[in-house]
Structures are given as structure tokens and as C-alpha cells.
């Protein structure tokens, strides 16, 4: 969705080559995570700040991840989760996983279900305060009711 066609073709070819390598060696190539998980500006800025604070942080992921994500579509299974409870938490300003995607999953999920849309946060801002406390509050309340 966020790649040009030629980039998509190149990524699929690299994934195919990596799949063949995994079949013969059991190993996957590691690449910079931004090659696979294209960040929005806010996410890129947060990641750069995190790397400055922790230069030893791992910034690579296996190419195998491409196959794992291309081959999975949550819309195919979300309606099969019920009657197990499912909590969707998204953020209003998420530009990586648009809130509409969570809303679509929620619409197709069976009960019990809940959708929380946090106001004013981007994708990775939910992992730090004050958003983190909101996420944990919703999560603990949900677990308290359904565990």
C-alpha cells in the first residue's frame, strides 16, 4: 500500500531469494527494519531518537518477516475468534496502521469485543506516557472482565 510497484516487485524478489536460502541453509538474511516496515515521519523520528538513546538496540529484522506478513490477512480469521473476547486498541493519529483498519476488523469480529480509539497519538506514542497508561487501563479493565 505504501510502496511503488517497482519497489514491491523488488521486495517480492528478495523475499523469494531469501525463502530459497532458508530452504537450503535454515537461515534468513537480516535487513534494516525500515526496508520492510516503512515508517511514517513520526515513527522514523521516534526510532531515531530511541537509537540515539540506545545505540546497541537491534534495528534489523529477518527477510522471513516478508513472507509471514504477506501470507497473513487478519480479515480472514477475525470472525472465527468469537466467542473468545477481543480488544482492539488503535490511535487516532496512527499513520502506519490506520484506525479504519482496526474499525474494519472490529466490525467483522464477533462478541465479546471492544474498540478503543486513543485520541491524539501516533502509532508508537502508545508505548510511552501518557498514552501507555491509557492503554494499560483499558487492557487491565478488559482482562479483569474476561480472564
Residue ranges and their predicted role:
Residues 1-51:
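Alpha/beta-hydrolase-fold enzymes
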Residues 79-82, 107-110:
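Short, conserved loop/helix-junction motifs that constitute active-site signature segments
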Residues 115-117:
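Conserved beta-strand scaffold positions in the cores of enzyme catalytic domains, especially
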Residues 81-82, 87-90, 94:
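Short beta-strand/loop motif that positions the catalytic acidic residue
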Residues 138-146:
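C-terminal alpha-helix
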Residues 121-134:
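Catalytic histidine-centered segment of alpha/beta-hydrolase-like enzymes
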Residues 95-101:
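Conserved alpha/beta-hydrolase "acid-adjacent" motif
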Amino acid at each position: 500500500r505504501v510502496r511503488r510497484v517497482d519497489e514491491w516487485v523488488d521486495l517480492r524478489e528478495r523475499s523469494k531469494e531469501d525463502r530459497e536460502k532458508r530452504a537450503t541453509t535454515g537461515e534468513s538474511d537480516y535487513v534494516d527494519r525500515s526496508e520492510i516496515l516503512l515508517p511514517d515521519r513520526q515513527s522514523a523520528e521516534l526510532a531515531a531518537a530511541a537509537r540515539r538513546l540506545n545505540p546497541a538496540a537491534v534495528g534489523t529484522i529477518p527477510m522471513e518477516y516478508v513472507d509471514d506478513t504477506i501470507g497473513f490477512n487478519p480479515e480472514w480469521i477475525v470472525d472465527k475468534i468469537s466467542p473468545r473476547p477481543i480488544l482492539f486498541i488503535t490511535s487516532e493519529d496512527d499513520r502506519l496502521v490506520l484506525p479504519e483498519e482496526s474499525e474494519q476488523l472490529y466490525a467483522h469480529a464477533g462478541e465479546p469485543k471492544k474498540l478503543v480509539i486513543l485520541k491524539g497519538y501516533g502509532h508508537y506514542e502508545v508505548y510511552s506516557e501518557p498514552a501507555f497508561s491509557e492503554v494499560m487501563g483499558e487492557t487491565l479493565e478488559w482482562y479483569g472482565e474476561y480472564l
